[in-house]
Amino acid sequence: MFSLHIDTARTWRGGQNQVLLTVNGLREIGQRAALVAHPDGELRRRVAEGLELIPLAPLTEMDLSAGWRLSRMLKRLQPDVIHAHDPHGVAVAALARSMATGSTGSTGSAGARPPAIIASRRVDFHLKGNSLSRWKYRQVDCFVAASEAIRRMLLQDGVPADQAITVHEGIDMAHVRAAPPVNLHETFFLPHRAPVVGNVAALVPHKGQRYLVDAAHLVVQAVPDARFVILGEGELRDHVERQVREHHLEKHVFLPGFRTDVLGCIKGFDLFAMSSITEGLGTSLLDAMACSRAIVATEAGGIPEVVDPGVTGLLVPPRDPQRMAEAIIALLQDDTGRRQMGEAGFARVSERFTVERMVAETAAVYARVVGTRP
């Protein structure tokens, strides 16, 4: 099986990490995998030597030049599967396959069958209904949903049940174990022994950090030495910083921005908080649980498929700072319970959310789709 993977993002977020884990994992089980990535992107920078890498930067979803370049590569490489990992990737894959097959219905002079298009769906948003979106998603042979919550949304959008398959995302447990811990108290000059509540997410509206800051305002009234470290960058940085100032939390809430040592920072957290309004699955939750950290998270999207309430963490409604603050306070004041939840989270991730399981299930999707196509 030969799969060609497409991710057009320049930034590094959970989705790009999943792409890299998938591609490397497929190669480890003996499959051929190549990657189309943005030439200036963080994903391309992190690719290991030996991987077939094709730089491509579509300017728009219907970038004819990018589509033409990719169509020529399809004719030369003749992959069995094109796995598009983001919406722009779906568009360029659909365009390139259409250009490559033309009126012959094949991608090669010998009449090779055109590749199947697999589309990963990692966000719990509905598919857009404009004409371009309808066209590109009609070209998809199978959707891979990162959670059952996303799969249900795809079915609501009219995707046939046999063309939407859930494959929960996974993490590399060995990589997590190998990450050196970061002493957050020294790094960010936090008071000695101050409990640290951490969040890792882009500063964008649906991640809900504004509600986390509101919760922090309530938490420090009950736990005055508590500190909050929010890792990530995004369009809402100015808004969140202003909110911190309005609540007079400058000594309690820190926004260090994007860091490459995220796993080490998570190991320095006493508690992991996720404030998302919507969430496909939440791979940062998996990282935190793999680091044996108890969780306080919202019930958004696929999060309840990860966090076992009362066992690995506590779940609260989205957009509810009061409930989030109460859950954070409860766990900060219960060292034993917090430790037990962290241990249970580690066991849950080790059993259900490994990269090996994710790769095996992804390979099975490829085999099924390729084997059943006319």
Residue ranges and their predicted role:
Residues 309-310, 314-321, 330-335:
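Conserved acidic donor-binding segment of nucleotide-sugar-dependent glycosyltransferases
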Residues 258, 277:
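Aromatic "clamp/platform" in nucleotide-sugar-dependent glycosyltransferases that forms part
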Residues 176-191, 346:
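A short helix/loop element that forms part of the nucleotide-sugar donor recognition site in Leloir-type
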Residues 13-24, 195, 199-221, 228, ...:
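A conserved mid-protein helix/loop that constitutes part of the nucleotide-sugar donor-binding site
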Residues 115-146:
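A conserved, positively charged/aromatic
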Residues 35-37, 294-297, 307:
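Short hydrophobic beta-strand element within catalytic cores of glycosyltransferases
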Residues 5-65, 235:
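N-terminal strand-loop element at the rim of the active site
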Residues 140-166, 171-175:
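A short, active-site helix/loop in glycosyltransferases that binds the activated sugar's phosphate group
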